[in-house]
Amino acid sequence: MGDWSALGKLLDKVQAYSTAGGKVWLSVLFIFRILLLGTAVESAWGDEQSAFRCNTQQPGCENVCYDKSFPISHVRFWVLQIIFVSVPTLLYLAHVFYVMRKEEKLNKKEEELKVAQTDGVNVEMHLKQIEIKKFKYGIEEHGKVKMRGGLLRTYIISILFKSVFEVAFLLIQWYIYGFSLSAVYTCKRDPCPHQVDCFLSRPTEKTIFIIFMLVVSLVSLALNIIELFYVFFKGVKDRVKGRSDPYHATTGPLSPSKDCGSPKYAYFNGCSSPTAPLSPMSPPGYKLVTGDRNNSSCRNYNKQASEQNWANYSAEQNRMGQAGSTISNSHAQPFDFPDDNQNAKKVAAGHELQPLAIVDQRPSSRASSRASSRPRPDDLEI
C-alpha cells in the first residue's frame, strides 16, 4: 500500500496544538487505523479478487459477480475514510501555521517600533495595537498559541466535520456491505447463463477485521463528541472566569495603563500629585523640613515643635506691639495628622514627601528671653 509517512508527519504536528481529547483521537488514528491498515488488513484482502470463484466456466461471469458483491474494496474504502476524517484536522493545522506566520510578522514589526521608540518616536499606540492583534490571534509569550477566537472556531468546526464524516462512512459501509461477510454469494447477471454461486476466501477473518474497524470508528466518533463538549464548556468557563475575575480584567493585555504624568488625573489613577499640599501651613518665616509622616516619634515631635513655634511667634508679635487679634490662640492648637489608615492608602498610592520638624532659621538669644520678662516703657499700666 502507499506510503503514509507524509500524512503522519502532518498529523503529528497537530498534537502540539490540540486538546487532550484531540491527542487521544490522533493516537487512535495512527495506531488502530493507519498502522493496522498498512499491515494486517492489507494482507488479509490481498487475494480478494483472485480467490473469488464461481461455479461456472462462462468468461466474464466471475468479474461481474465480484463487481456486484463488492462495488469497492474494503481496504480502499477505509483509506478514503481515513483521508476524509483527517482533512478537517489538516485544515486546522493550516490555520495554526497562518497564525504562526502572523506572529512572525507582528514580532518583526514590534521590534522595528521599539527601535524607533529608543530614538524618541511616540509609538505607544502602535505597540498597543500589536498587543491587541496578538491577543486576538491567541498568541501568548514565548510563541505559544492559545486556542482562542478564530482558532477556537476552526477547531470546533474541524471536530464537527470529523464526526459527520465518521457517521457518513459508517452508514455507507452498512448500506453497501453490512458488517459481516458470507462465504457464498449468489449472482445472476449477464453474461452468466444462469444463477451461479460464488465463494469468498477467508470470510471469517475478514469479518473480524470489519468489526474491529467498526469499533475503532465508533471510538473515534465518541472521542469527537466528548472533545466537542469539553471545548464548548471550557470556552464558556474561561469566558465566565474572565468576566468575574477583576484582577484578570485589570491586569490583562488590554487594560489601560495609569497616567501618572498628568497632575489632573493623578489622584484618579492611584498616583500621587506633585502639586498636592503635603504638610500643614506654617507661620511666616518658618520652613518645614520634609520627612516620613508614618514615623510615630517624628509625628509627636512635629506636633510639639509646631505648638512651641506658634507660641513663640505670638509672644514676639505681642512684644512688638502688634494687634493681638492678628493671631489668636486658636492657631496654636495642635495639628492632627491624618489617621493611619489614610496614611497607609497614600503610601500605597505613591511615594509622598511628608513634613518633619519645623525649624526656625533665626538664632535664639538670651537677651530676647530676658527682655521678655522685664517691664518696658510702652507697657500698659493697670
Curated annotation (Swiss-Prot):
The modification S-nitrosocysteine is found at residue 271. It is found in: Cell membrane; Cell junction, Gap junction; Endoplasmic reticulum. Induction: In bladder smooth muscle cells, exhibits night/day variations with low levels during the sleep phase, at circadian time (CT) 4-8 (at protein level). Expression starts to increase around CT12 and forms a plateau during the active phase (CT16-24) (at protein level). One of its GO terms (molecular function) is monoatomic ion transmembrane transporter activity. The modification Phosphotyrosine is found at residue 247. The keyword Oxidoreductase does not apply. Residues 45-76, 177-207 are extracellular. Residues 317-382 are annotated as: Disordered. Residues 264-382 are annotated as: Interaction with UBQLN4. Changing residue 368 to A: Loss of phosphorylation by PKC/PRKCD. Coiled coil: none annotated. Contains at least one intramolecular disulfide bond. Phosphorylation at Ser-325, Ser-328 and Ser-330 by CK1 modulates gap junction assembly. Phosphorylated at Ser-368 by PRKCG; phosphorylation induces disassembly of gap junction plaques and inhibition of gap junction activity. Phosphorylation at Ser-368 by PRKCD triggers its internalization into small vesicles leading to proteasome-mediated degradation. Residues 2-23, 98-155, 229-382 are cytoplasmic. Disulfide bonds join 54-192, 187-198. Keywords: Acetylation, Cell junction, Cell membrane, Disulfide bond, Endoplasmic reticulum, Gap junction, Isopeptide bond, Membrane, Phosphoprotein, S-nitrosylation, Transmembrane, Transmembrane helix, Ubl conjugation. GO terms for biological process: adult heart development; ATP transport; atrial ventricular junction remodeling; blood vessel morphogenesis; bone development; bone remodeling; cardiac conduction; cell communication by chemical coupling. Its main location: membrane. There is a cross-link at residues 144, 237 (Glycyl lysine isopeptide (Lys-Gly) (interchain with G-Cter in SUMO)). A connexon is composed of a hexamer of connexins. Interacts with SGSM3. Interacts with RIC1/CIP150. Interacts with CNST and CSNK1D. Interacts (via C-terminus) with TJP1. Interacts (via C-terminus) with SRC (via SH3 domain). Interacts (not ubiquitinated) with UBQLN4 (via UBA domain). Interacts with NOV. Interacts with TMEM65. Interacts with ANK3/ANKG and PKP2. Belongs to the connexin family. Alpha-type (group II) subfamily. This is Gap junction alpha-1 protein.
